[in-house]
Structure formats: structure tokens, C-alpha cells
Design a protein with these regions (language model features):
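Beta-strand segments within the central parallel beta-sheet cores of soluble alpha/beta enzyme folds
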Residues: 1-2, 28-37, 64-69, 163-172, ...
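Alpha-helical support elements that line or immediately flank enzyme active sites
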Residues: 1-28, 83-109, 135-175, 179, ...
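Amphipathic, positively biased hydrophobic alpha-helical segments used for protein targeting
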Residues: 15-19, 38, 72, 195, ...
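Generic recognition of flexible, low-complexity loop/linker segments
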Residues: 20, 52-54, 153, 196-200, ...
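Phosphate/diphosphate-binding loops
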Residues: 24-77, 205-210, 214-220
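Glycine-rich loop/linker segments at domain edges
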Residues: 48-150
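Glycine-rich beta-alpha junction loops
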Residues: 70-74, 115, 173, 214-216, ...
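Extended hydrophobic/aromatic segments used for targeting, binding, or gating
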Residues: 188-195
């Protein structure tokens, strides 16, 4: 009764449920094992999220207010669990009444005034889509982290400040996050400067980016180096440097 291992509560136990139904039909134990391509073809998808971020900056360039709002659709469920078999016998999915959290909204930064909240978008007719929805791993931190870290870069760019040095201003209380930020920057040979660089004259533009994330007492910093072909818009990731502090491993 093994699934192919789509972690983070994504597989929704389809394989065990299939095995239970089949074994009752034939009166014998039945093993069901999905291959990874099958899992990814039928797995639940992450519900849509909308991230809205605002910040207040004083005359000295200090962030004095941070306002983060996550809005998302709920997960769907049929007969208690969003199983494929439920849909195939005609049961309609029901929308769960909970958000997918707020983590990833920039809480590890020490802003003087900070608000990070999540709101649920009512989903009156979840049966109108053929897609099941569930955690997109984390469960919603991916979108929130992308939004908060991208916005930190936008503020740094607006102030003409290096993105690493800008983040360090608000991490003096957070030793572990400061250390992964510096470790990733040093290992990638990060050079302090405001972003972006002036436009280049060649056919390829180069860029870099840095981002931070935390989850379950784990702290991560990552630097990405990319190239963009100006004519086609094709993006190539040249290198990613990651500093990972996972804390105590038991």
C-alpha cells in the first residue's frame, strides 16, 4: 500500500484507500503502489495565494512598519478526505475552513511595528474545478517567503542599499539567521553594492539574488546567480549557494 512518497500530506493516502477497496472486492490482501509519474499526475495542487506587502520607511531609511497579508483559498475535501475514489463515485468536495498559516511573512526580521495575518477567501463551489487542493509543502510558506524576500529587495533597491547589508540591519537579534546570511554571502563571494547593476551592453544580462527562510527551527540562506539572454528572455541558473543551519539533529 505504498505511495511514491509525495511528502507534506500531499498524497492524501490514495494508495492505501485504493488497496482497501480492492482487497474487499477480491477478498484477499492487495498491494497498490503508485509510480512517481502517476503521483505527480494526480496529486493535489497548492491552492492559489495572494500576498500583499506594505512597509513604512522613515527619513533615515529605516523600516518602521511592516504589513503582510496572505489571502488564499482553502483546501478541498470530499467525505472527510480529498481522495480520488471519492470524486469518482460522485462525492462533491467540500472546502475546509482554515487558512494555510502565516509563516514566511518576514517574522524573523525585527521591525518596530509588524503585522502578519492570513485571511481565507470563501470558496462556495469547490466542485467547479477538477483539481484537488492541499498543501504545496510548508504549507504556504513558499509563496509568502517569495513575496516577503522579494519585497525586502525592492525596499533595498529603493534605498540604494546592498541587499545583504540591508537584511543584517534587522537581524541583530537573530544570531543564527545572521550567520546563515553571511555564510551564503561569503561562500558565493558576494560583493556589497546596490542592485541592480547598470544595464550591460552585451547579449546576456547577469544577475544575483539572496533570500532567507526559516522553518521548524531551521534557518536557510541562499544566493542565486543567473543569466538572461536578452533576445529570447531565456533564464539560466548558473549557481546556487546555500547555507543551511538545521539545528540539533536527533
Amino acid at each position: 500500500m505504498e505511495g511514491s512518497g509525495c511528502y507534506g500530506r500531499l498524497s492524501t493516502d490514495d494508495a492505501p484507500e485504493d488497496a482497501a477497496v480492492l482487497s474487499r472486492a477480491v477478498g484477499k490482501p492487495v498491494r497498490v503502489q503508485w509510480m512517481r509519474d502517476e503521483e505527480h499526475a494526480w496529486e493535489p495542487k497548492g491552492p492559489a495565494q495572494l500576498e500583499m506587502v506594505r512597509a513604512g520607511v522613515d527619513a533615515q531609511g529605516k523600516v518602521v512598519a511592516w504589513d503582510f497579508m496572505d489571502r488564499s483559498f482553502p483546501w478541498t475535501a470530499a467525505a472527510g478526505m480529498p481522495l480520488l475514489a471519492s470524486r469518482q463515485v460522485g462525492l462533491k468536495p467540500k472546502a475546509q475552513g482554515n487558512t494555510n498559516g502565516t509563516q514566511g511573512g518576514g517574522q524573523f526580521y525585527s521591525f518596530e511595528n509588524q503585522k502578519v495575518v492570513a485571511a481565507l477567501i470563501p470558496w462556495v463551489h469547490p466542485d467547479e474545478t477538477p483539481l484537488r487542493t492541499s498543501n504545496l509543502r510548508s504549507p504556504g510558506d513558499l509563496a509568502r517567503t517569495f513575496a516577503s524576500e522579494s519585497f525586502m529587495d525592492e525596499i533595498a533597491t529603493g534605498l540604494g542599499v546592498d541587499p545583504v547589508q540591508f537584511r543584517l540591519r534587522y537581524l541583530s537579534h537573530n544570531k543564527r539567521m545572521s550567520e546563515v546570511l553571511l555564510a551564503a554571502a561569503n561562500k558565493s563571494q558576494w560583493k556589497d553594492r546596490p542592485s541592480p547593476l547598470p544595464a550591460s551592453s552585451g547579449s546576456v544580462a547577469t544577475g544575483r539574488g539572496i533570500a532567507l527562510a526559516d522553518r521548524g527551527n531551521t534557518y536557510v540562506g541562499a544566493v542565486a546567480e543567473v543569466e538572461v539572454e536578452k533576445a529570447s528572455g531565456n533564464v539560466r541558473v548558473k549557481r546556487i549557494t546555500i547555507a543551511h543551519d538545521c539545528g540539533l539533529i536527533v
